[in-house]
Amino acid sequence: MIGYNIAKVHSYAWLNIPIFYYPIPKRPTLIAVSGRNQELTKSFAERFGYKRTYSDWRGLIRDPEVEVVDICTPPNVHSEPAIACCEAGKPMLCEKPLARDAEEAKEMLRAAEKAGVVNMTGFNYRFVPAVSYAKKLIDDGFVGRVLNFRGAYLNVEVGDWGYINPNFPLDWHFRAETAGHGAIGDLGSHIIDLSRYLVGEISSVAGATATFVKERPLVDKPTVKGKVEVEDAAVAAVKFANGALGTIEASWMAPGRKDFLRFEVTGNEGSIRFNLERINELEICSLKDPNDVRGFRDVWTTSKTHPMMEKFWVEQGAGFGWEHSFVNELNHFADCVMSNKPVTPVGASFYDGYRNCLIMDAIVESEKTDRWVTLEG
């Protein structure tokens, strides 16, 4: 494990795979974790049961007992460890966004393809049963020909009113060198991934971004302010290669929204919509229903017959939690590693991570040029 923040839920997932998916071919063993702050790294290792710690990720990758690497660092510490894993022949999962920009992501993709190692980008919402069921319904023709995708991820980050508070410190999220993008990388990348997963490839975008808080107190000098270098919010209109239209929105300045990831897919025969704040439900509408009862209805998606629930240990109808999406995600990754097979189409590969970065870069370019941007490929 490289990193110790979002790595908490990743570690929880690794530890719980044998519980939820028992019996399994091979039980994951938490060997080592690396982090810059040794006090926090050691505390993290003790909490989750890692055997040893490293202050440098290079030592962790060289460790002969480490067979698989999970990269859970800020975006500026994604490409080097990932490429080093490829050179060492070790499969890896890298948290989203895959990189700070598409150029960096492409280098990671090329290294993975050259090495032939199993690679995965951490888009965990693909592994929510309701989302997976939406994918199945769309593929089975429930909505007919897809016409529109509408997606938004809105929240107010943790803290004293979160990032909307101008006194929230200028941490790595607000610097282009470490984050690459702001809200669109942190939140919008999930919507971009779901749009591609559910509808198909995006061919062109027109975007707008805004930075509402221009300066913030420095982390180590609170009386001094520094410039915010990334966006607080972004919106984009998109065209899909199959002719569908879409909208994408991301903002970490949305009071009242805790973790509001929502998408709606409409077709010529029906519609599907999902809200992460109601994670177990999928709303569906079919034009085949009688007119007097036609409309959205809720489907509880945690029965054994629903995708991602076939081997889940919870009783039929019991609630599925956000953290469980990581259990499903990492179990899928582990299965692909042991079988030496690609993580796609269920999971997101480095190619998906690269395309995601390409779209984010295009949205920012569109804001700068005030033009539609056509995507390569």
For the regions a language model picked out, list residue spans one by one:
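N-terminal Rossmann-like dinucleotide-binding module
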Residues: 1-48
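Short acidic low-complexity segments
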Residues: 22-23, 52-65
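Core-facing hydrophobic residues within beta-strands of well-ordered domains
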Residues: 28-30, 66, 146, 202
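Hydrophobic residues in well-ordered beta-strands that form the structural core
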Residues: 54, 94, 119-121, 150, ...
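Beta-strand-loop-alpha-helix segment that lines the small-molecule cofactor/substrate pocket
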Residues: 68, 74-127, 141
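Predominantly a Rossmann-like dinucleotide-binding segment in NAD(P)-dependent oxidoreductases
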Residues: 125-228, 282, 370
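Glycine-rich phosphate/pyrophosphate-binding beta-alpha loops
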Residues: 189, 249-258, 318-321
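C-terminal glycine/acidic-rich active-site capping loop/insertion
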Residues: 214-231, 235, 239-242, 263-264, ...
